[in-house]
Design a protein with these regions (language model features):
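Anion-binding and metal-coordination hotspots
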Residues: 4, 8, 67, 74-87, ...
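A short secondary-structure junction motif
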Residues: 40-45, 88, 92, 477
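Hydrophobic alpha-helical membrane-insertion signals
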Residues: 1-32
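Conserved catalytic-core motifs characterized by acidic clusters
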Residues: 95
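A generic alpha-helix surface/boundary motif
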Residues: 15, 63-64, 122
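Basic, short loop/linker segments at the boundary and entry of helix-turn-helix/winged-helix-like folds
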Residues: 26-68
């Protein structure tokens, strides 16, 4: 049997005309697209953020290319990006043989891009729009929750703070009552202050007053003395801590001590199947042809209250150009419908019962719900299932958690006694009373017609394969399920880089 033959292999062979890095990068490679796009956009805002004094800095265009290309290839760590610039031909070509270390990359990402990345992202979107790849006028909007880089056991809950403050209030009232009962008549305590809105100033004054009163009193009960010592030692510090925590919470119900901007939310990835809450951010995006056109981050676990800020960001970036918005039932509130109507944006936005109403079997069922009652606008009356008039009896006002005020009308039937449908129609005693939100009802009727039009059916179909696959691609294909940076400002930078990376990947595909 003969010897095997191999191709020549001389590791130390010198080359008379060695190839350049440019020769090693294919002409159609993604890395060239990254370089071309960043070369075309205006980076003046980023360049102006550098000072003219001191040692020469790495060029921001080079650092931006390296970071964006890293995010395209699932390289999110600054240390791995540092290594790639020394070991990977594509990164070496992008950086022109510069070798920024991980501290430089981190400072660039966390500091230099803080006030500039949004304008860079907008420039990329406008460049793609000019090429006809996307539209900034018709978008598909959806949200997802992404876990924050925070310890899931370092939580602060608003309810816990309120409970602790209520306990403090009761203990102060109790010790005050005791001090009044044992104090001398000439040194008797006045009535206790109002602890309803307890704060640090009230607590400090109350503690000082109680200590003075009890110090003048003989034979103070040992348990009460121990209780007063505990209050003196802990309450002033605790109430200050609670006030600081409430200031951080704002309108939220929780936050993480590790990342104070993160809110505890229920994630889709629940491997223990116990509904555990984790600190995270609600990421909202608008897409067109699977390109990300706009993004915002929110502390709200639900999508309903995110739409206004999301649209305002779109207008801030591109002006008032939005013509239509398509979204799921999570956005179908009266407040959002009013917002879209005010801004003349076509609302292809489902409401919570829309999908059920599409089912013919559901519509055939006899329903006694208030939305099924016939309304006569001329008489301003409703008709119950038995045909009896239900007269208007007054208004009801409600405020949503966002502060939006809803106006409802109340109607009452005249005689439900002895009605054969009484048990099925309503369970309460007396005549049936219903509340109707006519404004929301009109919005839903308009949206129902719009969604069932030819254009609406097409929009509903496209939403499923336009915006939703973008999240699936980023979270599953590119393994980004948890932010690496902390604080909302840095997390927004991170998501902005992911959005630019997604758009370039889509352009190349």
């Amino acid at each position: 049997m003969g010897n095997p033959t191999f191709k020549s292999y001389y590791q130390d062979q010198l080359m008379a005309f060695p190839p350049t890095l440019d020769d090693l990068v294919p002409k159609s490679h993604t890395v060239r697209v990254v370089s071309d796009i960043i070369n075309k956009i205006n980076l003046d805002v980023l360049i102006d953020s550098y000072e003219s004094k001191g040692r020469a800095s790495y060029h921001p265009a080079m650092l931006l290319k390296v970071v964006v290309y890293g995010y395209i290839n699932n390289i999110y760590s600054s240390r791995k990006l540092e290594s790639a610039c020394k070991e990977n031909v594509h990164f070496m070509w992008l950086s022109a043989m510069n070798y920024p270390d991980h501290n430089t990359i981190n400072r660039f990402r966390g500091v230099k891009l803080k006030d500039t990345l949004r304008s860079i992202f907008d420039e990329v979107v406008m460049l793609l729009a000019q090429e006809g790849l996307l539209s900034i006028k018709e978008v598909y909007t959806d949200g997802t929750k992404i876990e924050a880089n925070a310890n899931k056991y370092t939580f602060v809950w608003k309810k816990a703070i309120q409970t602790n403050k209520e306990k403090m209030k009761k203990q102060l009232e109790s010790i005050w009552e005791y001090a009044q009962s044992v104090s001398d008549k000439e040194d008797s305590l006045p009535d206790p202050p109002d602890f309803t809105n307890i704060d640090s100033e009230k607590v400090k004054k109350a503690v000082d007053t109680l200590n003075k009163a009890l110090s003048k009193t003989k034979n103070v009960d040992k348990k009460q003395r121990a209780k007063m010592n505990y209050i003196t030692k802990n309450f002033p510090g605790n109430i200050e801590k609670y006030e600081q925590q409430e200031a951080i919470l704002g309108e939220r119900n929780s936050y993480s001590k590790t990342d104070k901007d993160a809110t505890f939310m229920r994630m889709k990835e629940d491997h223990m199947l116990n509904g555990q809450l984790k600190p995270g951010y609600n990421v909202q995006i608008s897409t067109s042809n699977q390109f990300i056109v706009n993004y915002t981050l929110h502390p709200n676990p639900t999508d309903t209250r995110t739409l206004q800020a999301h649209i305002e960001q779109h207008e801030s970036s591109f002006g008032k150009v939005l013509e239509s918005l398509t979204a799921d039932a999570g956005y179908g509130s009266e407040e959002n419908y009013d917002l879209l109507e005010t801004k003349n944006i076509k609302p292809f936005v489902k409401y919570n019962m829309f999908d059920k109403q599409q089912n013919t079997n559901f519509n055939k069922k006899t329903s006694f719900g208030s939305d099924k009652l016939h309304y006569d606008p001329d008489k301003d009356v409703l008709y119950c299932p038995m045909g009896q008039e239900m007269s208007f009896i007054g208004h009801a006002k409600r405020k949503t958690t966002s502060g939006y005020e809803q106006t409802l009308k109340k109607y009452q039937a005249k005689n439900c006694h002895g009605c054969p449908l009484n048990g099925a129609c309503h369970k309460s005693n007396g005549n049936r009373v219903v509340e109707i939100n006519h404004s929301l009802k009109k919005h839903r009727e308009k949206v129902h017609e719009l969604l069932n039009s030819e254009e609406g059916i097409e929009k509903r179909k496209k939403r499923c394969y336009d915006v939703e696959p973008v999240f699936g691609n980023i979270k599953n294909n590119h393994k980004f399920k948890r932010f690496m940076l902390r604080g909302k400002e840095k997390v927004e930078i991170e998501w902005g880089l992911l959005a630019i990376a997604q758009n370039i990947r889509k352009k190349v595909a």
